[in-house]
From Swiss-Prot:
Residues 165-333 form the Helicase ATP-binding domain. GO terms for molecular function: ATP binding; chromatin binding; DNA binding; helicase activity; hydrolase activity, acting on acid anhydrides; nucleosome array spacer activity. It holds the Pfam family RapA_C. One of its GO terms (biological process) is positive regulation of transcription by RNA polymerase II. Its EC number is 3.6.4.-. This is RNA polymerase-associated protein RapA.
Amino acid sequence: MDMAQYQPGQRWISDSEAELGLGTILAQDGRLLTVLYPATGDTRQYALRNAPLTRVRFAPGDEVTHFEGWKMTVREVEESEGLLVYHGLTAQNEQRTLPETQLSNFIQFRLASDRLFAGQIDPLPWFSLRYHTLERRSQLLQSSLWGLGGARAQPIAHQLHIAREVADRMAPRVLLADEVGLGKTIEAGLIIHRQLLSGRAGRVLILVPENLQHQWLVEMRRRFNLQVALFDKERFAESDASNPFEDTQLALVALEWLKEDERAQDALFAAGWDLLVVDEAHHLVWHQDQVSAEYALVEQLAEIIPGVLLLTATPEQLGQDSHFARLRLLDPNRFHDLEAFRRESEQYRPVAEAVQELLDHGSLSAGARKAIHGFLGSEGDELLASVEGGDEEARSRLVRELLDRHGTGRVLFRNTRAAVQGFPQRELHAYPLPMPSQYEELPAGEHPDLYPEVNFQQQWEDGDDNNRWWRFDPRVEWLIDTLKMLKQFKVLVICAHAETALDLEDALRLRSGISATVFHEGMSILERDRAAAYFADEEFGAQVLICSEIGSEGRNFQFAHHLVLFDLPAHPDLLEQRIGRLDRIGQRHTIQLHVPHLENSAQQRLFQWYHQALNAFLNTCPTGNALQHEFGPRLLPLLDGGEDKAWDALLAEGRARREALEAELHSGRDRLLELNSGGAGEGEALVEAIEEQDDDFALPIYMERLFDAYGIHSEDHSENALILKPSEKMLDAGFPLGDDEGVTITYDRAQALAREDMQFLTWEHPMVQGGMDLVLSGSMGNTSVALIKNKALKPGTVLLELLFVSEAVAPRALQLGRWLPPQALRCLLDANGNDLAGRVSLETLNDQLESVPRVSANKFVQAQRDVLAKQFDVAEGKIVPRHEERVARAKQQFAAAMDEELARLTALKAVNPSVRDSELDSLRTQREEGLALLDKASLRLEAIRILVAG
């Protein structure tokens, strides 16, 4: 293409993304061409020399459509300054003129027929691949699991319920406040993933404490295949872009750096985001008369970013003032007065009790009846009468109605271990060991015997192994003996420092020959993956994985159930994080905790504090942070020494305070909130659906067809795993294999959870979606000619098989694909114009077909060109009623769904101020735009297969 021929206003169509509709040239700038696709609102930039575009040029006899909807038949085409002007007649015989700039953005093209008559005929298997890809894409867009089933995680009911409930809102603003170990990060990842897939969000900003950056990076990449850009001072400074944040879809930023860098803050505010995610939001300090810099920064971002997810500790841990501060970030108009919030919170207690009575299936108390009537009025009375008549559906509906009207039920989700089943038990094994003389001689310092080996690591420089700390530390001898005793089990060892982990690996190798691998923050993600895979391998893997404190963040080793705490962390939350590597939902064994510690040392006293005062080994300790804050100033001096009497008194006081706090937490449990957060059975249905999808063989069968078509070689790796490599015949270098050298994949969820070095292929995986995009965005498979061997057909009989796609071109955020997904409508015409598609399936035909050489196929097509062109019109006439029926049904269902949701939220707003006006306005706009775009739904000829009886 002569570069001078690109003119602003010209209409072009993308060769690789035909679904975008007509494009308009916006600008030609240097070596770049900018094209706007008004139908979807997308803008693309192409290299000028090889832009994958085709000029839209209609010929006399073609029908064209104006953007206002009227049509005309072209009689004459003229060109003026590079732009086309069409002259023609409308159906009413009016003469009209239509400049190409005013063409409808939704016009579709018969690219398949153009290719067929140009002699571009494809190999036979490609037609079937295109059909199956269209069918599967249509099913996926309608699936309630879309964005939920593809995570590398065990499907867990409460997580799936929260993810669907939140991700299906436009611009959700919610607080995720589950107890530790219930998977807030996974919930956030599921929400991000589903919002991105559905188009409800396009750009996401994740703010985290600096020490959690790596954990988030690993979680998002490993579990959700989300490529997150980690921003820090160096990356920001080195970027040549005017605004470095604008170049990424998902940005991960540390709050500590951001609050100190005003230039980065300005860039972040200007970048434009759809969703803000803030982890550890309870550390944002707010008081009525003063706020921290971090809180003020998040508050500014929350004012300009439509969607906000705050991940935080439970409301009971925070205290009501701090909890109110989080809610205030989500909706400052709704949560503006702390005292009013306190009063409102008290009003919901009777409703929670009524819901509990309904779920207990007993007779309802007078108080419960009063609460139900007070909240639901006559509607509640009617449902109550049905419940007492034995109507279980009415009972479920009554529970749902009460949950919906709960004060913060739409903005706050909080699950507790008490409410969620599936956690393992814990057993503690303590091993007091004698203090070696080398440690006793250490100079006094800050907790010298919590991590006494550190002093010797700093001193050891002469390379003499005999002087190394692990030669005399009794914990090492104990560890070797314990590992030998547990040789048939996988054992996870965690210590505070990376240097200690490396030393322990040396000690095990040199002193015992025990197979161990190490895991610490100095390793790259790839190195950690390999270490984790080596540990997970049942047959040839390491028995032991030795982790540093930071190195194991975000990892899941629940296939093991023996945990050695080689030392103890200085904070109970870190202790819970360590145990949480194994203590997760889905762990099938009792967790065995092995804790060696040196007698008469800070180690022993810290062990006693965690066990006797906090009970932190045998149970989770939601009060740990509060107790540490309260007792820390007295605890730390006593760790290093001090009288036994004072120490025993502190243990007793700590235990009493913990028990009092736990009783307070239990009495303050918001049962209504727990029920709403758990989903009251909806999450279990999602789990069952995902398990059913996992057991389906449709994906492996489809992917084998895809691999064969693109020249991807697959071979067995092990049970449930394959190795994929590009072959010499690889068709497209753009196939999203992920690694030019090859990758190992599995379709098995359990295998993927144990082996993080393997790609977990689901319908949502980038390789699968990218492969489907390649098929549908390219033209391969939209023309085919074959010989059909069927004795019932006379030789020379011609059957014409056509695939039409019925679709609405619309921005993804409207999610019209749920009601009118692009669907292949198949037509099989015989010589008499009868449609046989309902009687003869595509698979039945495939079994009877043989390939035809391209030269012969092309000769036949050219000879039959006029006949075929007429049959295309006959086929379209057969398909149009089916298309119109689909569109009418989609409009009806879409309008009904929107009206139902609008009615629900409008009624809810009257009793629950958590419903924002912006939500209702957004839904009304969505309804209008959606119906208008469904009216413009189009039918296009996607693929042609000519079958000649032989």
